[in-house]
UniProtKB/Swiss-Prot annotation:
The gene is dapF. The active site is at C75 (proton donor), C216 (proton acceptor). GO terms for cellular component: cytosol. This is Diaminopimelate epimerase. It comes from Rhodospirillum centenum (strain ATCC 51521 / SW). It is found in: Cytoplasm.
Amino acid sequence: MVRRFLKMHGLGNDFVVLDARRDPLPLTTAAARAIADRHTGVGCDQIVLLEPPRHPAADLFMRILNPDGSESGACGNATRCVASLVADGSGRAEVTVETATGLLRCRLRADGSVTVDMGPARLDWTQIPLAAAHDTLRVPAGAGPLQDACCVGMGNPHAVFFVDDAEAVDLATLGPVLEHHSLFPQRCNIEVAQVLAPDHIRMRVWERGAGITRACGSGSCATLVAAARRGLTGRAAWIELDGGRLWIEWHGDGHVLMTGPVATAFTGELSETLLPGSLPSETPLPETVPA
């Protein structure tokens, strides 16, 4: 069996998109890892499965798998990509994407960018969640120079660390340590943020289950909320990421809106070796190698 896929990205945060609305595709953890592998698979930050909606108000259900096979409850960049696909296919400018954490209402803009209502920011420690009660404005989770996190839930957990120089942070070393910090029972996405102006933030991200990525939509939302809560910015700002920038707004009703571009890189077909149930089993090496 061969399945077609789309390779899409939002600011370089890239996805393998598989349409399973008519033909179910129960991806195994091993298959997800194989597809996401950048050397032997297609390669991506996340795999996105399009499934039939559970909620009557939704156009479809979006399932998100990380490169390690774990599931994510939210991904802002993937939501924009999926909303653009549905809008293009239906001719409608407004689309509702269902995820494991709720409904996300999206609007296709005239310039091709997409605005997503990411829902309300979750600020209570039980909603992140944390392993113990703390004021999420200042959480005693840290490693090395990264201390004093501001935690925000955006359908997935985020810990934002404000620094003087985001480029100087060794995120490849500190990211995995903080992702698995004991205060984060579901692990955590880690953002390092440098405020450049009241409406401009430089941010780098370590995503749980994926590592360093070029952009993170939900992380950008969490960063703006954290900065506004600490009085470092207003309630709307550009978030400058490795792959480009997103415009984030935190409205008075608590909802966070994200606007940014989408792109399709290419289409392709998954070979049988990458599909669930058909991954080759490990074969022992022969005792001698033929000449």
